[in-house]
Every structure is written in structure tokens, then in C-alpha cells.
């Protein structure tokens, strides 16, 4: 894959100007189960192992229809190669029954949990990819630093 980003001059820093040369996108996958594991896991028992693939394969997954259920995951630290311009979380989801639900991306930094206000509607049996871009740490409101990523948990919540 190529690393690319587009800054269109709108919004807040750092996404409103040229970011400079020498940056790259680092993909991280869950490395262990986080503080919350409310969702059902197949085949089990480790929640993170069911979602640590870069592409879904329908043999391992977590699922829930219960509003408020939260599943969090720890991630390994990225390589120390310069500043962090943002964090982007990708989630692939679909419904397996007939009940539509809203899916929210959740970030836990230290002891504070933050989720999207509205979330995204999951109402299709085909996989949909939901992306949440966070140029700033939504818990602190300032630019990401390495310590933020080292102590980060990210996951999903039924809205």
C-alpha cells in the first residue's frame, strides 16, 4: 500500500496545511484484549485475536446487539520514527441478523474513555468500512504524542 493524505486547507491544524516530507502511515493491529470485553467472541476466548487481521475473514469476529456494549483493544507501540500527525481507526462491520445498530469508535487514553457522538449506522449484511480520523487526541484536545499511543486502547461500542 502507498501512504498518502490529503489536506485541503480547511479544519484545524495539522490537517489544513502541507505536512512536510518524510512521514509515513503505520498500521497497528490489536495485540491484546483491553479493559472492556462486553461483545461475544467467535471462536474465543481472546477478543483481540478475533479482530487482529488487516482484512476480515468471517471465521473470527466479535458481535453484539446490546446498546452500550464496549470492546477495547491494546496495541503495540509504533516504531519511534518522528512526530505523530494523527490517528485513524478503521472498523469493518456488518449485521448478522435483522437488528440495525449504530457503531461508535471508542478511544481510551489513561482512564478517560471517549466515543463518537453519533456513530455510524450498521444496517447492511455486506461489510462496511468505517473510518475515524483524529488529528488531535480527543481526550486531551492537543496533538498526539508517543506516550498517548503507548497508553492507548481503541475499540467499538454499540450505540
Task: Please give the residue ranges for each predicted region.
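Disulfide-rich extracellular domains of secreted proteins
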Residues: 1-159
Amino acid at each position: 500500500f502507498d501512504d498518502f493524505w490529503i489536506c485541503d486547507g480547511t479544519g484545524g491544524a495539522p490537517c489544513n496545511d502541507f505536512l512536510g516530507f518524510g512521514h509515513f502511515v503505520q498500521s497497528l493491529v490489536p495485540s491484546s484484549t483491553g479493559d472492556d470485553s462486553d461483545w461475544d467472541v467467535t471462536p474465543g476466548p481472546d477478543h483481540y485475536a478475533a479482530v487482529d487481521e488487516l482484512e476480515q475473514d468471517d471465521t473470527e469476529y466479535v458481535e453484539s446487539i446490546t446498546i452500550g456494549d464496549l470492546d477495547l483493544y491494546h496495541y503495540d507501540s509504533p516504531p519511534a520514527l518522528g512526530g505523530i500527525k494523527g490517528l485513524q481507526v478503521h472498523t469493518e462491520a456488518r449485521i448478522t441478523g435483522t437488528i440495525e445498530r449504530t457503531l461508535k469508535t471508542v478511544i481510551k487514553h489513561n482512564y478517560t474513555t471517549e466515543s463518537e457522538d453519533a456513530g455510524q449506522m450498521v444496517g447492511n449484511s455486506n461489510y462496511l468500512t468505517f473510518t475515524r480520523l483524529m488529528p488531535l487526541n480527543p481526550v486531551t484536545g492537543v496533538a498526539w504524542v508517543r506516550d498517548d499511543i503507548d497508553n492507548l486502547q481503541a475499540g467499538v461500542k454499540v450505540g
